[in-house]
Amino acid sequence: GNVWVTDFAVNEARTKGHQVHKFSSSGELLMSLGTAGQAGSEPNQFNQPNDVVTGPDGSIYVADGHNGQGMTTGQAIAAGIEAGSTGRIMKFSADGTFIKDWGQIGTLHGEFRTPHALAFDSEGRLFVADRGNHRIEIFDQDGNYLDSRYSYGRISGIFITEDNMLYAIDSESSGTSHPAWSNGVRIGPLNEDRITGFIPPFDSDSRPYQGAAGEGIAVDADGNVYAAEGPNSLSW
């Protein structure tokens, strides 16, 4: 199948970054969304896109805006919005035509402080890991708010299995960013807000940051869990 990636950061020449790319399985570039090297909040721009997923009908959904998680007061949020920072979900047709967006930096339902990961379930609901607000927000495909989950920590990546289990990797919980919580992988039934399993990070003498910065997660058909880690380590 095709591979989608978010090109989050801008290069020094400002000729790359703030884009979403679609590649074939052989690496051929098929589509690019966003304006290369230019951050913004217009329909043809991204400002640090975090994740991309395709919906049941082929529509494209992008979680846009990374720095909202650092805005912890109403004053900071207002200043961030005024400066052009984003916290939104953007929807495009399968051919890349902009359809709509929803959300801004904030704490209400339908607002985000760093929407960091996306996943669809078998019912076509969109799950958004709202990392800065320590929750998962659930929407229909038109952006209407449905529900929330609060048991998964400060979430960087999510994965939903065919048997309706939710896996969420928490890379940032600590005594300063999310007191009384620890990082690791939390597992729970999709339609309930409770945890039934936990995979803690593991120690390594040679790699002191191991297990401390998990950004993405996947589960294969045999139940094996894969986690991508960065920037200070390479893999779980």
Predicted regions and their residues:
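Eukaryotic scaffold repeat domains enriched in small/polar residues
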Residues: 1-236
